[in-house]
């Protein structure tokens, strides 16, 4: 089941490393849903959590945070 995740890269991540991460997303059968302009971050769609875990392992040195993209509600 495909899921969307918000991935934030570390501030000092060089553009070439960010490109490698994005290439890996596509290689894993995923896609880029949205690119954030203010922060170095992306919403990605991946086939399953296994693919996400492989991306996290491969690019652990540049990934700051990963969270599932879902609705947020306030009280």
Curated annotation (Swiss-Prot):
InterPro entries: PBI_I9, S8pro/Inhibitor_I9_sf. It is found in: Cytoplasm; Nucleus. Cytosolic inhibitor of vacuolar proteinase B (yscB), probably regulating protease B activity during limited proteolysis. PBI2 is a component of the LMA1 complex, which is involved in the facilitation of vesicle fusion such as homotypic vacuole and ER-derived COPII vesicle fusion with the Golgi. The keyword Transcription regulation does not apply. Keywords: Cytoplasm, Nucleus, Phosphoprotein, Protease inhibitor, Protein transport, Serine protease inhibitor, Transport. Transmembrane segments: none annotated. This is Protease B inhibitor 1. The modification Phosphothreonine is found at residue 74. GO terms for biological process: protein transport; vacuole fusion, non-autophagic. Originally, 2 inhibitors of protease B, inhibitor I(B)2 and inhibitor I(B)1, have been isolated from commercial baker's yeast, which consists of both S.cerevisiae and S.carlsbergensis. It has been shown that S.cerevisiae only produces inhibitor 2, and S.carlsbergensis only produces inhibitor 1. A sequence for inhibitor 2 can be found in strain S288c (AC P0CT04). Belongs to the protease inhibitor I9 family. GO terms for molecular function: serine-type endopeptidase inhibitor activity. The lineage of its organism: Eukaryota, Fungi, Dikarya, Ascomycota, Saccharomycotina. One of its GO terms (cellular component) is nucleus. Part of the heterodimeric LMA1 complex together with the thioredoxin II/TRX2. LMA1 binds to the ATPase SEC18.
